[in-house]
Each structure stands twice: as C-alpha cells, then as structure tokens.
Amino acid sequence: MKGFLLLLSFMTRIPMPKTDYDEEKLGKSMKYFPVVGIIVGFILLFFCIIFNFILKNISYSAVLPLMIIVVILTDLITTGALHLDGLADTFDGIFSYRSKHKMLEIMKDSRLGSNGALALILYFLLKFILLFSLTIESREAAVYAIITYPVVSRFCSVVSCASSPYARGSGMGKTFVDNIKTCGLIVATVITLLYTIGMLFMPFILFTNYSLPMQFMIRSVLIIVIIVGLLALFAFAFSKLIERKIGGITGDTLGALLEISSLVYIFLFLVIPTFFIG
C-alpha cells in the first residue's frame, strides 16, 4: 500500500497523505500503474458528468467540443503535465539527430525546443480530433474510451519498463526499470484486462433491465483484447526503437510512450470495430 501511495503521489497531483520516500517500494509499485489510470479515468468521467449537468440545456453539438477540452484539461491538471513534459523532451532529443550522449543531454534540458513544441501541438490536435470523431461515432464508446485510455496507456509504460534497460546510470525512471519483473508485468496485464473487459459489463451491474446480445458482448471482449494486445506490441516496438537510438529508455521516453499510446488506443478504438461489423 505504501508503494502505491508513493506511486500515486509521484504520478499525479492528487492530494495524498505524507509518506516517507522509499525508492525500492516505489519501483516495485510500477505493476500497479494501471490502477493509477483507473483513478484518473474516473476523475475524467466525474468532471464530464458535472460539466454535462451544468450545460444540460445547451445543444449537444455546442457542448461536445467544450466537453472534449474539459477531458483534456482535466487529464493535464490531474497528472501535472508530467508525461507531456516527457513527450516534449523525447522529441527534442530524438529528433535532434545527434549522438546518443548528446540526445540524452538535450532530453535533460528543461527548456522547450522546437521539436518538443511541435510534438505538443500535434498531440493536443490529434487528441481533440480523435475524441471528437469517436464521440460522433458513438457516445457510449467515447465514455468507455475516456475511462479506459488512462489505464491502457499506463500499462504500455509497464511493458516498456519490462522490455528495455535504462539508458542512464541514474534517474527516477531507473527505479521502475530495475524493479519491474516478469511477475510485475503479468500483474499489470491482468489488472488492465480485467478492468477494460469488466467495464464492458458495468451497465449490466448498474441496470438490471439492461441487455445486449451475447454475440455482441463476445465480439466486444475480442475487440478489447486485440486492442490491448496491439498496444503491448506497440509499446515493445517503441521501446526497442528508443533503445537503438539512445541505448535504453528513460523517464522521459516512458512519459512520451504513455501519451502517444493513449492516442493510438483511441485511434484503434475507432478503427478495429469496423472489421467486426456485419
């Protein structure tokens, strides 16, 4: 529990009781990173519900863009832009096309470069467009994606930690890389699959008169398993690509992967179901 509280306080801006820092416990708690995503997902849902209630008398088409902005801003505030900072730093370093040592130096620089700025602009544009498109396609699917993408994206970070060595001799990310084991990856995988599949059945739990054809439910579970599997492969490939560039992963690349995989997840959620229609 202490390790998880440390992880939650480190990875979010959620007020937490003061806990003595323990590097080993923090590192070993990485397997529970998807649980942090569950908490973030429900925070996003909560603010969506509040915002929708406040503006319930305004037309849906007018509220939708604002709702998506609320989701993006809530995510940003909840995490303190920690992972976005990693995204910008990673793009500044990798796309400098310098030596491994120089790339790592650039990534440690707190100043925002042109590549990092471009990455952030593209990230926000893509996230808005993808969430908007998914909501137009299906409101239910959009709500599901909002409460699950924080989980799956954090699962990808766990996959990365288990896939590649740490690029530097020291650093916060090294704590997670050194302490994540195969059993930790299995725990994170089980949590992710149980949650993403379990949320499909939530309407049945909340509403006793809610029913859907069994074939539809089986197909939905299959889609989720495929998407999570593809994201795991993406995380592995991303980690190996970064490893070739700088000799391993860093805390910045973990943050970059988290944010990029959230976009890939929403994109796959738009595309993969089309192969099962008919």
Curated annotation (Swiss-Prot):
It catalyses: alpha-ribazole + adenosylcob(III)inamide-GDP = adenosylcob(III)alamin + GMP + H(+); alpha-ribazole 5'-phosphate + adenosylcob(III)inamide-GDP = adenosylcob(III)alamin 5'-phosphate + GMP + H(+). Signal peptide: none annotated. Its cofactor is Mg(2+). The chain crosses the membrane at residues 35-55, 62-82, 116-136, 141-161, 185-205, 222-242, 257-277. It is found in: Cell inner membrane. Keywords: Cell inner membrane, Cell membrane, Cobalamin biosynthesis, Magnesium, Membrane, Transferase, Transmembrane, Transmembrane helix. GO terms for cellular component: plasma membrane. It is a multi-pass membrane protein. GO terms for biological process: cobalamin biosynthetic process. GO terms for molecular function: adenosylcobinamide-GDP ribazoletransferase activity; cobalamin 5'-phosphate synthase activity. Its EC number is 2.7.8.26. It is an enzyme of class 2 (transferase). Pathway: Cofactor biosynthesis; adenosylcobalamin biosynthesis; adenosylcobalamin from cob(II)yrinate a,c-diamide: step 7/7. Its main location: membrane. Joins adenosylcobinamide-GDP and alpha-ribazole to generate adenosylcobalamin (Ado-cobalamin). Also synthesizes adenosylcobalamin 5'-phosphate from adenosylcobinamide-GDP and alpha-ribazole 5'-phosphate. PANTHER family: ADENOSYLCOBINAMIDE-GDP RIBAZOLETRANSFERASE. Belongs to the CobS family. This is Adenosylcobinamide-GDP ribazoletransferase. It comes from Fusobacterium nucleatum subsp. nucleatum (strain ATCC 25586 / DSM 15643 / BCRC 10681 / CIP 101130 / JCM 8532 / KCTC 2640 / LMG 13131 / VPI 4355).
